[in-house]
Amino acid sequence: MTVFSSGVSRRGFLRHSAAFGLAAGAASALRLPAFAQSGLPDIQSVLDKISVKDYVREDYRKLYKMSDDPLWDPAKDWIRTVDWEKVRSEQSGKTVRFAVGAADQESAAEGLKPFEQLSGIKVELVPIPDDSFYDKAVSEFISGNASFDALQFFSPWLGDFAGPGFLADLSEYADKWKLPLDDFYDTYRLNYGYVGGKLVGIPFDCDVQMVHLRKSIMEKILGGPIDRAQSVPSYDELIRVTAEANKLGGGVAGVGLMAARGFWATYTWEHIAAQAGLTLFDSQWNPQLTSDAGMKAMDIIMALQKNAIEGVSGAGWGENRAAWLGGQVAANISWQDSGTQAMRPDQSKIVDDFVTIYEPRISGGVFAPPNIAGSTSCVAATSQNPEGAFLMLAFLTTSSIMAMNEANANGVAPGYRSVLANERLRAVSQPMKVWADSLEHAWCAPRIPGMFEMEQALGNEINRAVTGQISGKEALENNAGSFCPAWRASGIWSTADIFSPSDINVSFSCMASYLRFVQPILVKGWKYSRHSNGAGVPQTFMSRTLPGRSKFVMTLGSKFASSAICDIGPEHSIIMPLASV
């Protein structure tokens, strides 16, 4: 999971062992001789170095006695099936500009050398500060002349970027270059790749949340070895056994879970609510937070937090990971990499003392392991070389590189069926069989504009419940009226009065207990213009004249921290603060 706007992400936390999707252990292998101006290196010689021997860390290879055999299916590994001679004939000498987090710039440059040698394309990196990646990307998109051709980002932002038309349709390139989309699990292909029926992304970091147990503790409580499907079949049983574990003492709490403010708490709620059959919206986009499924999840969270490690209300991924790998909890609700990393002695104190189980059930619910977070790879609609950008992203997400990321336990997860089915890789990734089985039934939050902001606001309220400020019911009720599209929440006009349903692509509002817009409404067909106002302040104007209507104008300040004014005809003006909640 990559979260550019927060202080801690799984990839950021492990930056020393990941090179923007490529393992740091590959650094020496990537230093191939620079290609001469008269020609490029031999293709096969470059591909031969993208191997287990050269990419997977030496200490891990020795620990697990790994052979040089591939951890992927070569017949489905895009870099080994694409026609690189054709790529060179069409793209050699061209340039692709790639937006990366500023802290990843050096590792990204190293990791992309093989692509440059295979394709003849020069990659220019456009560093963006990690804590302002979203705002910077949006402002560049709106300018109509983004400084980058491609970017990888947190997949919950996909709706924000795709809805207004900021991302290129990749379908033509995927067909031409035979990208193996059918090898991705449906949950990743559909939720990290497609928006409105168009392919706008290639899945990159493919996540699923899971439940992990400490064997030495839970086997005492359960009276024998842990059966991954039967020992803890329900959340009621998970509550019981973690309560028992909590009584054992010894500096080990019953359970770890993420309940920090913002999306962390929301993701825990979505994880559990999905098992109760949660549907976030009905067919009319009415929020379903206070449905039976939503309320049941809050009840379970409130029960589990009584058994949780101290400080759970401040736990995001980093804190949760440290507690689990440090042996401070008997059970953990987190991502799949909590299982892979727990196997690595340099990262974990619980090697050989844990097991990842199938998702516990809820009476009357469904089996719906949650695909939460993750990241995707996209091309800007304004790209100067969209085809070259696509080829670069296809290289970064190819199955061999993703498989070796998993072997290196760097938190960048593969989403390919052929990779997760590989028995050699399963031998070094304990959760993988349960993980692979679970993906056939995965649940995912919709990739709609503003979803991430809504999840942030909801998480703030859930955190208040966990800390005892309000009840679980109040946490959901406080967001029930605002967890909905801006055009419905405003109450000022109906979309039918201004736009046809096929005409509008909008961002969502993010509100806590009051109405507050944090993103502009963006509509297909807007015209963008930029000039200074009377005070000399640069402003961006977006306007559109609709048949039989007055011109619809939005004025944006020079920064997203300013306000926008929407004039709808001669009578209505709406001030829209754009600062984050």
Each model region followed by its residue ranges:
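Extracytoplasmic/periplasmic substrate-binding proteins
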Residues: E110-G111, Y267-H271, Q275-A276, M295-N385
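Hinge/lid segment of periplasmic solute-binding proteins
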Residues: V46-E90, S155-M210, I239, D353-E359, ...
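Extracytoplasmic "Venus flytrap"/periplasmic binding protein-like
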Residues: K113-Y185, K220-I226, A323, A330-A331, ...
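Conserved C-terminal helix/tail region of periplasmic/extracytoplasmic solute-binding proteins
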Residues: G39-Q91, K122, S438-P501
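A structural signal for short loop-to-beta-strand junctions that line the ligand-binding cleft
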Residues: S139, A146-D149, W177-M218, R361, ...
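N-terminal secretory signal peptides
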Residues: M1-G12, A19-A27, L32-F35
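Helix-loop-helix "hinge/cap" segment bordering the ligand-binding cleft or interdomain interface
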Residues: Q117, E124-P127, A174-D175, D182, ...
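C-terminal lobe and pocket-closing loops
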Residues: K53-W72, Q336-I350, I362-N460
